[in-house]
Amino acid sequence: MTETQSLELAKALISRPSVTPDDRDCQKLLVERLYKIGFAAEELHFGDTKNIWLRRGTKVPVVCFAGHTDVVPTGPVEKWDSPPFEPTERDGRLYGRGAADMKTSIACFVTACERFVAEHPDHQGSIALLITSDEEGDALDGTTKVVDVLKARGELIDYCIVGEPTAVDKLGDMIKNGRRGSLSGNLTVKGKQGHIAYPHLAINPVHTFAPALLELTQEVWDEGNKYFPPTSFQISNINGGTGATNVIPGELNVKFNFRFSTESTEAGLKQRVHAILDKHGVQYDLQWSCSGQPFLTQAGKLTDVARAAIAETCGIEAELSTTGGTSDGRFIKAIAKELIELGPSNATIHQINENVRLDDIPKLSAVYEGILARLLAGNAV
């Protein structure tokens, strides 16, 4: 493929150091491009976060691309082989922070829109973009707030493509059609501090928690299903003591996380954890935080259309998967009938020397255009 517009736009976006939640006028650049082909733009900024809702058309179905202009920090700049915010072509790849996650995806969808609208100026339905600068950070003032606004006025999405990097070995080999939920716990086990030579005068919270910890790690929370692996329980941090070797600690702090399937619920997991702790007589405080519920798009029109577009452009059959971390799809699913994630390789995201293959860039744009054509121009699947 010789199409170069996607590459040039990706470079323009990467060159803007939009470390979360700073947008650095990335969204302004997108608005300038899409305004020329009939998109209306609505700014929905909250705090330091910039959000934009772009839409062309007023009819249904609504096909929406969702993405984020913010990127994670670069890490030690001296470890990069080229400056992270100077997009560099090298060894058949485009290097730069945000190349994979996810400025290339945004660029590819914009250029796909430009070509599609040029060929189908009177297309069916509507095309929309939901872009935020707060996905890599706290994600409190970004997509979730925009979804609240759209939901309040009854503006729904029929088909949503989130441009997160999803490819494993080659472009198009994987589509995410769902994500696991994420539930975190911050547990404080209470004991009684004392001299280590007089354990009968103290209560060691490490010892009282140990049997409960064993049971928590061995518990089968669910068996998963055809779309989701079994729910996973993992300890992320555990800390207790004063640093001295002769003091029994007065408390133990344990941080843990569930990545849970649709076979489990937030309430059910909480109840089972409390039951195990109570069973072992643990004295504790436990604070919970759920950053996302599990969601699933059953195989249907959107997955069929995406797979057909991938097969046409990449010559491979895409696998449907729910593996990996959370994304803003967890918020958008509240107003989207069908939602998938589809983007470039995820092999170098958040890493030093983040990159994408140069020849994947025009292909990804063509895949997005193929999805639009099948959903809004009546092209056969």
Curated annotation (Swiss-Prot):
Disulfide bonds: none annotated. One of its GO terms (molecular function) is succinyl-diaminopimelate desuccinylase activity. InterPro entries: Bact_exopeptidase_dim_dom (IPR036264), DapE_proteobac (IPR005941), Peptidase_M20 (IPR002933), Peptidase_M20_dimer (IPR011650), Peptidase_M20A (IPR050072). Its cofactor is Zn(2+); Co(2+). Binds 2 Zn(2+) or Co(2+) ions per subunit. The keyword 4Fe-4S does not apply. Keywords: Amino-acid biosynthesis, Cobalt, Diaminopimelate biosynthesis, Hydrolase, Lysine biosynthesis, Metal-binding, Zinc. Coiled coil: none annotated. Pfam families: M20_dimer, Peptidase_M20. The active site is at D70, E135. Homodimer. This is Succinyl-diaminopimelate desuccinylase. It comes from Neisseria meningitidis serogroup A / serotype 4A (strain DSM 15465 / Z2491).
